[in-house]
A protein has these predicted regions:
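Conserved Class I SAM-dependent methyltransferase catalytic core
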Residues: 1-29, 33-37
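Residues that form generic nucleotide/phosphate-binding pockets
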Residues: 6, 61-68, 96, 141, ...
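Sequence-level motif detector for i,i+2 pairs with an aromatic at +2
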Residues: 14, 30, 53, 133-135, ...
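Glycine-rich, flexible loop/turn motifs
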Residues: 15, 20-22, 58-61, 146, ...
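Short, solvent-exposed coil/turn elements at secondary-structure transition points
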Residues: 20-22, 68, 173
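Short, solvent-exposed loop/turn segments at secondary-structure junctions
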Residues: 22-24, 40-42, 143-145
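Flexible, glycine-/basic-rich loop-and-beta segments that form/coincide
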Residues: 26-80
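C-terminal target-recognition/interaction regions appended to catalytic cores
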Residues: 80-173
Length: 173
């Protein structure tokens, strides 16, 4: 890239590679391009620390947190709060099986936009995460049910702020 060449022309040693975050113990399926540059000599990222059968899972990351209902806040942790859901979205989530999404709903619960050719391509929205796998990439709207596969694996709610933070590897404190 132009930026990489600029760095090299300025005397930097450059390492650029895609990184799959679960390979480094991060419990989300985030892919990122990482660029490291040094004027002190060759530089590169450490080798992956986790193999696929060792990837950190949703259950390992958030499975010990207290249960919540949609709209509730844990009395001991103000960040462990789940957004309230409309009765219609609670009904939709109730019809979303483990690991499922809006595609599993009865037709009368499906949104009009999902019935169009364009809408069918967004198969993971209103989806539930799976305990045994890393979470999807956390986004700025990850505590909202309709913004991706951010439904709790077994509770009828979207993930809490605390759960999203833990999945992003922020500490409890």
């Amino acid at each position: 890239s132009d930026f990489e060449n600029l760095l090299k022309n300025e005397g930097y040693h450059v390492w650029v590679n895609p990184v799959y975050c679960p390979d480094y113990g991060i419990p989300q399926t985030r892919k990122r391009l990482v660029l490291l540059a040094s004027r002190l000599g060759n530089i590169e990222l450490i080798n992956p620390t986790h193999k696929p059968n060792e990837y950190k899972t949703v259950k390992e990351t958030i499975g010990d947190l207290p249960e919540l209902k949609a709209g509730e806040t844990d009395k001991n942790d103000p960040l462990h709060r789940a957004k309230a859901l409309s009765p219609l979205n609670l009904e939709r989530l109730h019809h979303t099986p483990y690991g499922g999404s809006w595609k599993d709903w009865p037709k009368d619960l499906q949104l009009r936009c999902h019935k169009t050719d364009n809408g069918r391509s967004f198969g993971s929205v209103y989806g539930r995460m799976v305990w045994e796998k890393p979470a999807p990439t956390m986004t700025t709207q990850c505590t909202g049910l309709g913004n991706g596969r951010f439904g709790h694996p077994i509770q009828d709610r979207a993930i809490s702020i605390r759960e999203a933070a833990l999945i992003q590897t922020f500490p409890m404190t």
